[in-house]
Amino acid sequence: MNNTEIIENASKVLEAIDAAKEEELRNLNSLVQPRAPLNAGSTPGEIINEIKHLSTRDQEGGTSSKDEEESGAGRTVAEGAATRDHKYSKSRPKKQPRSGLQSGAAGKNPTPDGEGGDTCNRELDQHSDGDGHSNTEGASSDLASIQPCQTDDAPCSSTSYLDEEDEPAVRPKTQCKQSGLIESKEDEDGMLSELHEQHKGRSKRLSALGRVNSSPIPSPRPDELLKKGHRREYSMVWSNDGVFIESWCNPMCARIRPLPIREICVCGRCPLKCSKCLLDPE
């Protein structure tokens, strides 16, 4: 934007503000008829005094006239402010697009009034050098990216950054978190169904084989090892090396009691001689 355009816009704004100020003064003069009318050179103090005079006169005259005049004054002030804002919005300069792509996108939709052509002309002017020579290379590259509309009613197609020959996007396969392998949707559903069946509630009554497979044999507690005459599937005996160890033998003769090494069974695992050892001396 040149300096001359900035100065012109500023002058238009000032003119709009002065016009709004004069209109507000005329509205105040219409309300204050008995006293001397206010002019454009009135100070803010004089305007405030006039407003105070109106308020005191309304209080003496009655509440009805006061409400009517206040509503009228409020409407006039609001209308004046709306007019000022409307004029100021009209006088404000419009922002120009900085890049050639933005200006091209804004002007690629031609209208009967020729707005699209004006946009293209402004685009060429923006690409011109300071000496007046136009930069035809930049303008041609920008204009090449603009796609013309097929019909006047149909909207223009946006610039596509993908080639027409590209294949459509395909849903990627999901990765299984447990196995670390890439599985398809069907495999994932089958795996979920199998897990659901595995975690279903089992029956409380189990057979002997099921109990053996499901629950392991509990290890003995230290206080149970000290009980005498308690039948278990294990026994604490003295080994030939003189070490008190845990041995597994016939439950009928497996009595937990510390015995000296001379009283060990023939098999070397039972505290006393049992029927099994007598029948099978080996």
From Swiss-Prot:
Composition bias type Polar residues, residue spans: 135-161
Binding site for Zn(2+) 2: 253, 265, 267, 270
Gene Ontology biological process terms in this record: symbiont-mediated suppression of host cytoplasmic pattern recognition receptor signaling pathway via inhibition of MDA-5 activity
Region (Disordered): 29-225
Residues the record lists as binding Zn(2+) 1: 230, 249, 274, 277
Ranges of Basic and acidic residues composition bias in the record: 49-60, 120-134
Function: Blocks host interferon signaling.
Keywords: Host-virus interaction, Inhibition of host innate immune response by virus, Inhibition of host MDA5 by virus, Inhibition of host RLR pathway by virus, Interferon antiviral system evasion, Metal-binding, Viral immunoevasion, Zinc
Protein name from the UniProt record: Non-structural protein V
Natural source organism: Tupaia paramyxovirus (TPMV)
Record GO terms (molecular function): metal ion binding
